């Protein structure tokens, strides 16, 4: 099976009442092991290339590896740009054959996040790819990207309603108190 978009795989997950795992990759060996396992288990998957791998110059080589290995698979696989940092990075991923892109405008002011996401949706839809956006923040550090712990990281429902009314994305990641990384002591969550 060729690669699919998130737009194709998420309705399948909803219909079957399953979760679709997402795996961040950074080497060809890890990629091969993941793809062999999802094929063996007949488990659709999202194969994501994150910012650490991109900073190491691996965007194109990892995309080529996934495309080559996925073409003979029966199990659907999404090739996904994780936490895309700019429109230019999204375009580079689409040119490398990604079927799904995330634009992470969560650090931007709300209206700027909407504007950049609308631009990415326009470009990605023209390329036949799906789009994920992000609202809020994830506490800590993910893929060598740190988030300011002083910024509120819980998204209010009205922001989600307003964002999805303005931008038609295929998936939306929202900060709901998630925390990544290692911490000394306990993380304190409030219900505020």
What residues fall within each predicted segment?
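N-terminal amphipathic alpha-helix/helix-capping segment at the start of soluble metabolic enzymes
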Residues: 1-20
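Glycine-rich anion/phosphate-binding loops
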Residues: 84, 110-116
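Conserved small/polar residues in nucleotide/adenosyl-binding loops
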Residues: 189-192
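Short glycine-enriched loops at secondary-structure junctions
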Residues: 51, 83-87
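N-terminal glycine-rich phosphate/pyrophosphate-binding loops that anchor nucleotide-derived ligands
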Residues: 3, 22-38, 80
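Alpha/beta enzyme core
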Residues: 9, 28-45, 64-68, 72, ...
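Catalytic beta/alpha-barrel core
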Residues: 22, 26, 78-81, 101-109
């Amino acid at each position: 099976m060729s690669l699919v978009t998130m737009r194709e795989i998420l309705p399948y997950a909803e219909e079957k009442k399953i979760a679709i795992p997402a795996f961040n990759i950074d080497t060809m060996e890890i990629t091969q092991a993941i793809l062999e396992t999802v094929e063996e288990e007949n488990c659709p998957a999202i194969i994501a290339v994150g910012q650490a791998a991109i900073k190491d110059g691996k965007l194109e080589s990892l995309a080529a590896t996934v495309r080559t290995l996925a073409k003979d698979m029966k199990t659907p696989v999404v090739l996904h740009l994780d936490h895309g940092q700019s429109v230019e990075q999204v375009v580079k991923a689409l040119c490398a054959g990604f079927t799904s892109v995330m634009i992470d405008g969560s650090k931007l002011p709300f209206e700027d996040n909407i504007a950049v996401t609308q631009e990415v949706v326009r470009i990605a839809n023209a390329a036949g790819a799906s789009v994920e956006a992000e609202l809020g923040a994830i506490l800590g550090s993910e893929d060598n990207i740190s988030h300011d712990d002083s910024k509120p990281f819980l998204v209010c429902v009205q922001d989600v309603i307003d964002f999805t009314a303005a931008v038609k994305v295929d998936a939306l990641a929202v900060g709901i108190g998630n925390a990544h990384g290692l911490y000394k002591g306990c993380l304190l969550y409030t219900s505020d």
